[in-house]
Amino acid sequence: MSNYQFTKPAGPFYLAELAEISGSTLYEGKGEAFTVSGLAKLSEATTHNLVMLHQKKYLKELKNTAARACIIGPEYVKFAPDSMYLLVHPNPYKAFALIAQAFYPSEKPAGFIASSAAIETSAVIGSNCYIAHGVYIGNNAKIGSGCQIGVNTYIGDGVTIGDDCLIEDNVSIRHAVIGKHVVIYPGARIGQDGFGFASDASGHYKIPHAGGVIIGNHVEIGANTCIDRGSLDNTVIEDWCRLDNLVQVGHNVKIGKGSIIVAQVGIAGSTELGEYVTLAGQAGVIGHLKIGKGATVLASGKVYKNVKSGDRVGGHPAVSISDWQKQIRFLKTAIKPKKSPKS
């Protein structure tokens, strides 16, 4: 259950309302007027909490839960207690997300500009923005309407931020154009120089980075994630991408629409990801590669060559999942101690 010290849920809601919000179907039309006061885990729920079942391993908890209402996939309906009201959805996790948004809507403060914020006179600030203490907004920067900018955040010269963005505390943004409905979590760094040098025996010679960073609409950038600007071209993050905490995106990288980049991933310069690519935790990709649409790199996979659309790869170096599994089986066999011959 949530900690009401920090988050108090809206509601209560009738189950019929939650069915409409989530696009779910009330099983056998039962429970329309049942009230739901909040969301909870199966093991912690009380009578008027709504729970969710989306994996078979939780069937025992479903049987023993005190909750009277459950979001459930159609394949699990037959396992639910007879006394339980069911919201049936082919993707229970999506239904849960939509219902959770209703219980915990984003709080948007009224327009406010702190007296300690430093805003250059040529900057343009949209209507109803919340700009916290210690914020700096540079020359010719443009901030869209309804934006929230957290404490001690730096917005550099010429940066453009679209409407209804949330830029949290201690973020720095330079050389960037950011779309609408973007969320950037604390400590993120966007638009700094990339790691580009020309080297010989006499030293390392810096390559100036004259490009920028382009971030689309409905993107989320995790805490302490770094996105370097391009050298001559731009670094691009397309619409609906999700970048977790502690991700490194090198200069000139392109990340296609809807891609998911999990924590501690590193993407070296000029690599291009197609749409809906997933890079799982601690995956690494060297520079100047292409990762095709819908491809997946499993956790800690290290990619040294192009990956085709739809492929799933893992290991170090990353290979197809079937080949990786063969390698693991071989290693297990190879390192297994041999029995001593009988004397």
UniProtKB/Swiss-Prot annotation:
Transmembrane segments: none annotated. GO terms for biological process: lipid A biosynthetic process. The keyword Repeat applies. Homotrimer. InterPro entries: Hexapep, LpxD, Trimer_LpxA-like_sf, UDP_GlcNAc_AcTrfase_non-rep. This is UDP-3-O-acylglucosamine N-acyltransferase 2. It is an enzyme of class 2 (transferase). It holds the Pfam family Hexapep.
